[in-house]
Amino acid sequence: MNQDYLHATLGRTGRPVFRLGLSASYRPGRETVFRAVDEGVNYFFAYGFDSQMVRALREVMKTKREEIVLATGAYNWILSYTSPRKSLERRLRQFRTEYLDVLMFLGVMKPKELPLHVLDEMVKLREEGKARWIGISTHDRKFAGQLAREGILDVLMIRYNAAHRGAETDIFPHLTAHNPGIVSYTSTRWTRLLSRPKGWPADQPVPTAGMAYRFVLNNPAVGVVLTAPRSLAEFNENIAAVRKGAPSDEEMAFMRRFGDAVYGRKEWFM
């Protein structure tokens, strides 16, 4: 992967990306999307219900479509048939664009939830040019590693943070052959990495969200880490933090210790 700390090529897509990507799932306001664009962010992940991002990106893409990497897609409903084609067509209408950059199949919890008909349909959409690249989001690290070895998918959206570091052994070593782009999410472990866990010494600090993102970005296997701020102020804090650059060895060691303490609580989190 060709990259510096804030810029990378997203795996075999060949697409240059700013390494902090934006999700608007927590409705931070349209102005946050516009500010992100101004700050150089170009990877945007959206669900179909992200109306703020939909409206903002419609406006941005009128003049900057080729600068934007739009990742969205179909939901894994598990108990019912999912059509990536129908989902793609809905997203094209929503965003008023002729193609998606990354068509995702979202929320794959186990291998059987990525049936062959879904994968075949996604490949066909890529061949047709309606999606430039295809990928999935999953928390199943072993399955993600398998998919990386097989080389069908262009992008893998995975969990990787200071508390959940298993991707370092289960996924990242398998990227070399086919070079899928890696997008990381849940960097704060649903904010648990920002709160003092039971037993953590009272005189010891607690990480900020920015520290959590910098921990993830320090791994060169990661192309993009997603931030999902709740406000423009949070976004400003997060991007200012990552612009500080790579964490020191001491900061990395601290994040691992804190991550171990959070993981040790054995709470169930996606």
Predicted features and spans:
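N-terminal binding-site loop/beta-alpha segment at the start of enzyme catalytic domains
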Residues: 1-68
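Active-site mouth loops of central-metabolism enzymes
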Residues: 17-30, 72-82, 107, 197-206
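Structured C-terminal cap/extension of enzyme domains
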Residues: 34-38, 42, 149-155, 169-270
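Short, well-ordered coil/turn segments that N-cap beta-strands
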Residues: 15-20, 40-43, 64-69, 97-101, ...
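Alpha-helix-loop-beta-strand connector modules within alpha/beta enzyme cores
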Residues: 55-73, 120-129
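Short, acidic/turn-prone active-site loops that include or flank metal/cofactor-
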Residues: 48-52, 74-76, 158-165, 187-188, ...
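Glycine/proline-rich, positively charged
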Residues: 76-162, 166-170, 180-183, 218
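Conserved, mostly hydrophobic/aromatic
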Residues: 10, 22, 44, 70, ...
